[in-house]
Curated annotation (Swiss-Prot):
It catalyses: GTP + 4 H2O = 2,5-diamino-6-hydroxy-4-(5-phosphoribosylamino)-pyrimidine + formate + 2 phosphate + 3 H(+). The active site is at 126 (proton acceptor), 128 (nucleophile). Keywords: GTP-binding, Hydrolase, Metal-binding, Nucleotide-binding, Riboflavin biosynthesis, Zinc. SUPFAM superfamilies: RibA-like (SSF142695). Pathway: Cofactor biosynthesis; riboflavin biosynthesis; 5-amino-6-(D-ribitylamino)uracil from GTP: step 1/4. This is GTP cyclohydrolase-2. InterPro entries: GTP_cyclohydro_II (IPR032677), RibA (IPR000926), RibA-like_sf (IPR036144). It comes from Shewanella pealeana (strain ATCC 700345 / ANG-SQ1). One of its GO terms (cellular component) is cytosol. PANTHER family: 3,4-DIHYDROXY-2-BUTANONE 4-PHOSPHATE SYNTHASE, GTP CYCLOHYDROLASE II-RELATED. Zn(2+) binds at residues 54, 65, 67.
Length: 209
């Protein structure tokens, strides 16, 4: 495994002080981060999330996706729980990178959905891999998880690496008029587990101009 632990530091946030653990992939040069909160109870399932980098949603407040909303909600949920973790993986644009993501957005502006846009650019709908989580989970000392996700691929990935997913915790937040079609495509074509109302009703607070 090419993932190497580098260092840890405190990370004050609006929800409390997390611990930030840095990792480097010597093969790809990518730098991944694990956030932990609180003291983990031995042998207990820990609330957590695998979150792939989304610069537009996480840092630029884009309403085209639900990523930033999911990240903030996950951090808030963990703080309220008193313990938990987030693995922040550098897999922008479901693994195609930032510039290709912008190219995909350009195609979406012309009418393609998120899956069609990736495929027109020559990519699979979802290019992400999750093998880098193995040493990250070992480092933070977690092997039983209550996983915050709507994506069954993340559940299967954890299970395939010998991690026990005790519970899948839905994370259905961030719906608005700009991402309604995106959420529906994630549900109908990518297999994300979302309730019908999540991608058919518009958030009136976001809908105001």
């Amino acid at each position: 495994m090419s993932i190497k632990y580098i260092a840890s530091s405190k990370l004050p946030t609006p929800w409390g002080v997390f611990e930030m653990h840095g990792f480097e992939d010597s093969e790809t040069g990518k730098e991944h981060v694990a956030l932990t909160f609180g003291t983990f109870t031995p042998d207990a399932p820990i609330l957590g999330r695998i979150h792939s980098e989304c610069l537009t949603g996480d840092a630029l407040f884009s309403l085209r996706c639900d990523c930033g909303f999911q990240l903030q909600t996950a951090m808030q949920n963990i703080a309220e729980e008193g313990q938990g973790f987030i693995l922040y993986l550098r897999q922008e644009g479901r693994g195609i990178g930032l510039l290709n993501k912008i190219r995909a957005y350009e195609l979406q502006d012309q009418g393609a959905n998120t899956v069609e846009a990736n495929e027109r650019l020559g990519f699979e709908a979802d290019m992400r891999k999750y093998d880098m989580i193995i040493p990250m989970m070992e480092k933070i000392g977690v092997d039983k998880v209550r996983l915050m996700t709507n994506n069954p691929r993340k559940v299967k990935a954890m299970q395939s690496f010998g991690l026990e997913v005790v519970e899948r915790v839905p994370l259905q937040v961030g719906k608005n008029r700009y991402n309604e079609g995106y959420l529906k495509t994630k549900s109908t074509q990518l297999g994300h587990m979302m309730s019908e109302h999540h991608f058919t009703e518009t958030d009136p607070e976001v809908d105001k101009d």
